[in-house]
Amino acid sequence: MLLSKRVTAVLSASLLTLACQATQAADSLNFVSWGGTTQDAQKEAWAVPFSKSTNIKVVQDGPTDYGKLKAMVESGNVQWDVVDVEADFALRAASEGLLEPLDFNTVKKDRIDPRFVSDHGVGSFFFSFVLGYNEGKLGANKPVDWTSLFDTKTYPGKRALYKWPSPGVLELALLADGVAPDELYPLDLDRAFKKLDTIKKDIVWWGGGAQSQQLLASGEASLGQFWNGRVYALQQDGAPVGVSWKQNLVMADFLVIPKGAKNKDAAMKFLANASSPEGQADFANLTAYAPVNLDSVPKLKADLAPNLPTAYAQDQVTLDFAYWAKNGQAIAARWNEWLVK
């Protein structure tokens, strides 16, 4: 009888613990992004209103780390519930079985731009690599398109380029070399690196948004490849910088749920909120990055809308996320070898 009571007590305690854990799981989720102003805006636009409407606490974590995400999934100890990742990684991770499939009864995809939704991820936001330039350094010579980067006589000074092996730099080199936008893929790597060789000594590399802004605003770089939102922020601060949207290169971040996430249902609801017309518009209005939801456009601030990629659709070149998902790792090896030559 005593043993029976002890067993009952142990079982009761175990059930209580499980119930508490289930309650905790339902009441919180871990959101992971890149930090800085982007994650601050995601918190303000998505996490705070989501918590108010659902009573689900959103715990901020980061920065996004692809190796860590993979290790969590493979070990079966997944601590993250929603992760902001680059679009090409989202596709590659899905092919490797690292992500949960989305529930499209919860996440409404009918009004999501089809470029920015897949079976395992929905767009967080999209942005463009644009040609930014320092007006004080270049004077009346206003760069028009990516060919200007390679014309060091007309446009003297350093060129700022994104240093990571990801979509963007190789494409702009090929466009500047005369490749038509609809003939970019598969990338002619020999041709792209040969073109970059012509200005390699004039390149200053940036790895994050704040660094890119400093290079441009200070004039250390006369012109270069920049995230559109960072150039817009400089303009709002009165910096003497201009921008060309010709052949702006469209890239995106996706929101994904790691395979085995402990709070999958709450995470799915978070994705639905973040990708809604209101969620996307609120984030865009804070950052000058574009919404993936087509119904968000009328909700944008009147003075902001002309400064978003959505206003320059006719000049867009959408980077091929699927191509990079398949070939990115091989390209990265060659990229890193070229950098140190």
Functional labels for PLM-detected ranges:
Residues 130-137, 174-178, 252-266, 282-285:
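A bilobed periplasmic-binding-protein/Venus flytrap-type ligand-binding module shared by bacterial periplasmic
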Residues 26-93:
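Early extracytoplasmic/lumenal segment of secretory-pathway proteins
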Residues 20-25:
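Sec/Tat signal peptide C-region and signal peptidase I cleavage site
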Residues 36-41, 78-80, 84-217:
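Extracytoplasmic ligand-binding site segments that recognize negatively charged/polar headgroups
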Residues 258-318:
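Mature extracytoplasmic/periplasmic domains
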